Amino acid sequence: MNNDNLHDKLTIWRQQQIELKGMLQLIPKFQSLNEIRYVVGLDISFDKSSPKAVSALVIYDLEQRMIIYKDYLCIEKLEEDYVPGFLSFREIKWYLPLLNHIPHQFRIDIILVDGNGVLHPVGFGLACHLGVLLNLPVVGVAKNYLHCVGLTESLDAHRETLKKHVLKKTTDHPILIHSIDQSSEILGAAVWTSSNSKRPVYVSIGNQMNLEQSIQLVQKCSSSHSRVPEPIRQADIYAKFVLSQSKRNKKN
């Protein structure tokens, strides 16, 4: 795709994000985290040697600490390249069939997805996009920091912030991520999910949640095994397993 076509596409996508942002619901659905039991985790695993990928969904029973349902979708080729700030247009179409295919006997309380929510250049990341389309509570949990030019501190500055925080041994408290403009709006948080975590995950509101609830839920869903909360971690493990089995079967 040439630069002109890409620019036109991104302009259309940005307009869609801005329009859909008006449908965000930032008033929490839940009065207490005790109302949340069934947590959907979503992730995509990519084959490093081919265009193939696998999207995976798990339903995690937070009370029993176990997976009660899982599904996957094999992707021959992702149709869009990754462009920072436009992840939803690359990945959301591979999540929606899985979400729409969940049997009716399973209840969904909330979704955790590998990606950002309002911590985003226009405040409408993948987690927000999913939440608006499905009218469900969603929390964005990104593994890496997304620098939003003119909105959040640079990557180098953020690394210094993390370093100081770790040296103070205050990783049991999240770092709130503020916008650097005059509003100083809180966009999300860098969260260490356990005492074993060397790096944080980046938590932000997707839909029908507030940030305090979102942070508490991510911590509640996490274990000492990984900095990534279990619903997303288990979806990632499952996607990688399906991808490896597919490659093994092809060789045989």
UniProtKB/Swiss-Prot annotation:
<comment type="similarity">
    <text>Belongs to the endonuclease V family.</text>
</comment>
<feature type="site" description="Interaction with target DNA">
    <location>
        <position position="82"/>
    </location>
</feature>
<keyword id="KW-0963">Cytoplasm</keyword>
<keyword id="KW-0539">Nucleus</keyword>
<dbReference type="GO" id="GO:0006281">
    <property type="term" value="P:DNA repair"/>
</dbReference>
<protein>
    <recommendedName>
        <fullName>Putative endonuclease C1F12.06c</fullName>
        <ecNumber>3.1.-.-</ecNumber>
    </recommendedName>
</protein>
<dbReference type="GO" id="GO:0005737">
    <property type="term" value="C:cytoplasm"/>
</dbReference>
<dbReference type="GO" id="GO:0005634">
    <property type="term" value="C:nucleus"/>
</dbReference>
<dbReference type="Pfam" id="PF04493">
    <property type="entry name" value="Endonuclease_5"/>
</dbReference>
<dbReference type="GO" id="GO:0016891">
    <property type="term" value="F:RNA endonuclease activity, producing 5'-phosphomonoesters"/>
</dbReference>
<feature type="binding site">
    <location>
        <position position="43"/>
    </location>
    <ligand>
        <name>Mg(2+)</name>
    </ligand>
</feature>
<dbReference type="GO" id="GO:0046872">
    <property type="term" value="F:metal ion binding"/>
</dbReference>
<keyword id="KW-0255">Endonuclease</keyword>
<dbReference type="GO" id="GO:0003727">
    <property type="term" value="F:single-stranded RNA binding"/>
</dbReference>
<dbReference type="GO" id="GO:0005730">
    <property type="term" value="C:nucleolus"/>
</dbReference>
<keyword id="KW-0460">Magnesium</keyword>
<keyword id="KW-0540">Nuclease</keyword>
<keyword id="KW-0378">Hydrolase</keyword>
<feature type="binding site">
    <location>
        <position position="114"/>
    </location>
    <ligand>
        <name>Mg(2+)</name>
    </ligand>
</feature>
<keyword id="KW-0479">Metal-binding</keyword>
<dbReference type="InterPro" id="IPR007581">
    <property type="entry name" value="Endonuclease-V"/>
</dbReference>
<dbReference type="GO" id="GO:0005829">
    <property type="term" value="C:cytosol"/>
</dbReference>
